[in-house]
C-alpha cells in the first residue's frame, strides 16, 4: 500500500532502489538517509530517529540503508561504492548519516571525496555526518554530545 506518485522519476527511483544490493527500508522519497554496514542496535536506531525529528524531519521521511558486506554475502553481492551512489542519488535526501567506518569508506569511494569523521561534510550537496561508530559514541555522555554536535549541523527541515 505505498502511494507512489506516477512520475517517471519515482519509477526510476523505485527501480534503482529495487536493484540495490543491500537492505533499503523506509521511504523511497526520504529526506534523511541513515547508512550503516550492519543493522543498527535499537538504541542507535532510536537515537538517530530522535535526532532527525529534532531537526524537523518526520519519521516517515527517513530511510535506512544497510550495506551488504562481504562477510555475509558472496563478494559479488556486496554493496559496491557505485551501488551506494546510485541509491543515494535516486533518493536524493537533504541529509545523510554514515554510522560506521565501513559505511564512511564506501561513501567516500562512491563520491570520490575524502570524508572527515564527526564534522559536517557535503556529498554532492547533501549534508552529511560520518561516524567511526555511532553505537560506540552512544555509550558515554561525552560521546552522545559529540554525535549530536555533528548531527545538528545537518540541514534543518524548515517547518512550513
Residue ranges, per PLM feature:
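A polyanion-binding, active-site-adjacent surface
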Residues: 1-160
